[in-house]
Swiss-Prot record:
This is Peroxidase N1. Glycans are attached at residue 212. Heme b binds at residue 194. Induction: Induced rapidly in leaves after wounding, mRNA is detectable 30 minutes after wounding, reaches maximum levels after 4 hours, and decreases slightly after 8 hours. When lower leaves are wounded, mRNA also accumulates in upper, unwounded, leaves. Wound-induced expression is enhanced by spermine, and suppressed by methyl jasmonite and coronatine. Salicylic acid and ethephon have no effect on wound-induced expression. Induced by infection with TMV. Residues 1-29 form the signal peptide. It is an enzyme of class 1 (oxidoreductase). Binds 2 calcium ions per subunit.
Amino acid sequence: MEYYHHSINKMAMFMVILVLAIDVTMVLGQGTRVGFYSSTCPRAESIVQSTVRAHFQSDPTVAPGILRMHFHDCFVLGCDGSILIEGSDAERTAIPNRNLKGFDVIEDAKTQIEAICPGVVSCADILALAARDSVVATRGLTWSVPTGRRDGRVSRAADAGDLPAFFDSVDIQKRKFLTKGLNTQDLVALTGAHTIGTAGCAVIRDRLFNFNSTGGPDPSIDATFLPQLRALCPQNGDASRRVGLDTGSVNNFDTSYFSNLRNGRGVLESDQKLWTDASTQVFVQRFLGIRGLLGLTFGVEFGRSMVKMSNIEVKTGTNGEIRKVCSAIN
């Protein structure tokens, strides 16, 4: 009996060590680590946090803007701040990036940090931290952000083709995510960022009036939701008008986005497909805690997936640079 308990204790200790090893691997990523600036610029993270909070208080739309910007940065050439670079043919000029916002928030934080820690903190890290702080500003859960990224020196609009599109099938979405080392759960979790933010009428109009050139709406749209969307985005109305991606909860980081998918009230075609495809529907159900399935806590899993995404093709050590100004290479 004593040997039995001893074996159980050893096994329990092994499992704890294994879990810790997994968490450490997740946090450290490819040369990044939590607290990278703790000795070289200890105020960096608090400056980013306060800057995001100040801008959010005057304009809540910066939160989804920054979160989307970080996603777009990581999916193109890795998380290296290349989305921040200005230029006639830079990433931010590509069609999927033309409505990004929050550049001023990142530059504001960078200016403050440079004043006390010149040449230390990368723009890529500021963006990663600001994305986390944007979720917190909208009442989402926090997570530890590994830092230590360096800034890239290449930014090309042509590379934006790696980004998932609003009309992509689930198979295409999964392929694009898998290419970046992200699995199906990561896909559903990260797309859950659409719980905050908006989309332009231009990207949903065909879905409302001429889906797949049928002359009618997407049949997956709930019958009571369709007239609401059509009222917001008339067939010949303002294509630039914005529509909330999470009806009724556009400014709160919560699971109502997934409830909307279950009820046929997803705004984007690619979002609603997460419910109609069995391989992704199961994760939507698990985030909703549907009985009979092993539940997943959305806020926790979102943070885990964000850490994975934030370590895509990062530049560390002597690769890249630390920009003096986020919008231009040194």
